[in-house]
C-alpha cells in the first residue's frame, strides 16, 4: 500500500536536507535515515525506515525545489501505514511547524 504526503513549505533550504541532518531527533520519533542520494539515482531523495518493532515499511522523500514542496511516499507491504505515517507527520509538525504552509495526506 502507498500513501502520499505533500508538504508545501515557505521558500528556503531544502526540507529533505534538513531531515537528513537531523538523525538524532528522528530517532525520538521512531524513524531512522537509511539512505540518501546515490550518484546512480535522481538527486534530492532520501529514505526513512521505522525503528519500532513490528512496524514495517519505508518512507521515500523527495524535495521539489521549484514548488518548495516535500513529497513523501509511505510504502508498506502488509503492515498498516498509519503508525509510520503518524510518526513522520508528528516529526514534521514538531520540527518544521513554521515552514509548513499545507500538509495533505492522500491514501
Region spans (language model):
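Terminal, regulation- and interaction-focused segments at domain boundaries
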Residues: 1-28
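A common structural junction motif
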Residues: 23-30, 92-96
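Secondary-structure transition/turn motif
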Residues: 50-54, 73-80
Amino acid at each position: 500500500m502507498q500513501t502520499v504526503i505533500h508538504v508545501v513549505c515557505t521558500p528556503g533550504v531544502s526540507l529533505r536536507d534538513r531531515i537528513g541532518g537531523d538523525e538524532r531527533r528522528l530517532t525520538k520519533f521512531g524513524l531512522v535515515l537509511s539512505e540518501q542520494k546515490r550518484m546512480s539515482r535522481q538527486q534530492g531523495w532520501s529514505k526513512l525506515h521505522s525503528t519500532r518493532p513490528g512496524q514495517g515499511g519505508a518512507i521515500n522523500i523527495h524535495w521539489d525545489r521549484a514548488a518548495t514542496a516535500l513529497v513523501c511516499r509511505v510504502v508498506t507491504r502488509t503492515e498498516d501505514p498509519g503508525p509510520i505515517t503518524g510518526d513522520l507527520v508528528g516529526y514534521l509538525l514538531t520540527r518544521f511547524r513554521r515552514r509548513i504552509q499545507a500538509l495533505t495526506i492522500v491514501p
